[in-house]
Amino acid sequence: KELNVPVGVIDCTWGGTPAESWTSHQTLKRVMGFQKKMAEMESAGFQREKLVELYHREMDEWLQQFDARDAGFKDGAPQWISALQTGNEWKPMELPAYWETRGLNFDGTVWFQKEVEIPADWSGKEISFHLAMIDDDDITYFNGKEIGRTSGCNTMRTYKIPATLAKAGKGVITIRAIDYGGEGGIHGEPQQMYMEANGKKISLAGNWNYHTGVSMTGAPSRPLSPEGTGWPTSCFPTV
């Protein structure tokens, strides 16, 4: 009113941080369950780079244990990626959608498969697969070959297969989706799921087959990243 100029204010806030994020190091040292993490921070000299290195080592170990419990792995290798699986354990699901909205109340890994027909004029051409967004992480395969992996629930997935692997006829896309908690699945709009080559698009939305791999229930606690707001003491300096 004083300047006679309209002013717009946007309140962009995000919640969900745990209490320990807002608590000091000295206080958490006295709280049962946090002593080990506080000792690690002290040993690292509170240096973010060293804590990140430790996190990556812990995450690698956790993933090895997690993957070892996944029904989709055998002797450490994925076993559902080379051919279309047809067992009774595989169920249909219409995608894209959070799988909770399709009746699957589950946190963990879910394997999705879809058989596609590669047109003759795509043979020998690079093919792009657009898979909307996947919550949280994924590893994607085509005819038994890994074509990409991404972390992050709100990141659009686009993977390419080289011209040398593009052959006319039937092919199988396999997606191992990993959801650590909350909503999970291949989500977005139907028009965001398609394959593309030679100036042509073919929709990938619709029915896929799925099989659960390993549940987060009973799994060891996933390591926390020191770069996230869930890390103990991370928000305390801003108080």
Predicted regions mapped to residue ranges:
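Structural recognition of the beta-strand scaffold that forms the well-ordered cores
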Residues: V7-D11, H130
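Aromatic-lined ligand-binding clefts that engage carbohydrates, nucleic acids, or primary amines
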Residues: W90, V116, W122-G144, I173-I175
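An acidic-aromatic loop/edge-strand motif
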Residues: I10-T17, S21-Y98, K167-V239
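Short beta-strands within extracellular/lumenal beta-sheet-rich domains
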Residues: F106-P119, R157-Y159, V239
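A short, Lys/Arg-enriched amphipathic alpha-helix followed by its capping loop at the start of a domain
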Residues: E2-L3
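Solvent-exposed loop and beta-edge segments used for protein-protein assembly and interaction
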Residues: F106-V110, D121-S123, A132, L165-G169
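Beta-strand-rich ligand-recognition modules
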Residues: M133, Y141-Q192
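Outer-membrane beta-barrel proteins
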Residues: R102-L104
